């Protein structure tokens, strides 16, 4: 891709999004949409697919080789493996692989009698899984995972989801190299189109990360795993901790009020990881819930230190928890809204660096919306 934007880099880095925290005022979610039949890949599901677990790498176990310890449930909300298989069988599905359970249910790759294409079953207690199912039932966009069916057996809900060949994390790991800028922009555009749609429906995902981006090919990508999603959200609100520490926005880590702009930060991290692989901006994920809470503080300090956040880049509201708790850690060694010095070590493509810089604006009010980002020249050319 040509560097047509190079001449405007100075202006772009000095220009910020409208500081208002406005969001689209939209009608309620559209009526339920019919089931769709997207193209499937015959490859086995990767280990990070379709799971709600937010910290650490996930592993899947083959049905025939699962250890006895896998049968034990750490959470009463997760049906036993035998119960999940019984439910799947009662609906005519044959389980061909069991994935590591998520925080809200069992996840299995299965086929239905007479239908050779594999699907993924997410089986959990009605109260939790059904909420996610109801949300997915009412969304319809090619860049958002399409739920094929919702099945209920007593107190258990079974979501039927399309099977993708990989998630973006596994895709990057297998490629073991940076994704070329033209391909990365095609992927990022689809992610932003999905977020634009969700945000217009007043839904925020709250856990956008490479593990939750499913991919069959560069031009067939979707946002998945809505276990942490929140609806309806219009104005910034106290929504609590959710998602993954390493990709959470500063306002989420500080437990301040936030809205859809939190997803933009996370999508910026995804773009950085595509363009800078294997480099990451922020590492050391927590391994326990206790560490998760503690690491929110350390992660926020790491963001301020790594990006050398200037005090002028904090929210204007002095009562914000982000301001009250963290402005004292800000630095004056970098002028506000200028290039983050840490980008120099990874040598990002100029278009990619500009986008990441905009999406990682520390103050959510200065962060562009998905709609604004999609209007940028590098996406208009695709």
Swiss-Prot record:
EC numbers on record = 2.7.11.1
The name this protein carries in UniProt is Serine/threonine-protein kinase
Tell me the enzyme class.
transferase
Q: Which residues form the Protein kinase domain?
A: 93-379
For this protein's source organism, the top of the classification is:
Viruses, Duplodnaviria, Heunggongvirae, Peploviricota, Herviviricetes
Bias kind Acidic residues: ranges:
45-75
Q: Which UniProt keywords apply?
A: ATP-binding, Kinase, Nucleotide-binding, Serine/threonine-protein kinase, Transferase
Active site per database record: 207 (proton acceptor)
Give the transmembrane ranges. none
Q: What InterPro entries does this protein map onto?
A: Kinase-like_dom_sf (IPR011009), NEK_Ser/Thr_kinase (IPR050660), Prot_kinase_dom (IPR000719), Ser/Thr_kinase_AS (IPR008271)
Show the segment(s) annotated as Disordered. Answer: 1-75
* Family under the similarity heading: Belongs to the protein kinase superfamily. Ser/Thr protein kinase family.
Answer yes or no on keyword Transferase.
yes
Superkingdom of the organism of origin = Viruses
A GO MF label: ATP binding
Q: Which amino acid positions bind ATP, per UniProt?
A: 99-107, 122
Which organism was this protein described from?
Equine herpesvirus 1 (strain Kentucky A) (EHV-1)
List, alphabetically, the Pfam families matched.
Pkinase
Q: Which reaction does it catalyse?
A: L-seryl-[protein] + ATP = O-phospho-L-seryl-[protein] + ADP + H(+); L-threonyl-[protein] + ATP = O-phospho-L-threonyl-[protein] + ADP + H(+)
Please note every region of biased composition (Polar residues): 12-24
Compositional bias, Basic and acidic residues, is annotated for: 1-10
Q: Give the gene name.
A: US2
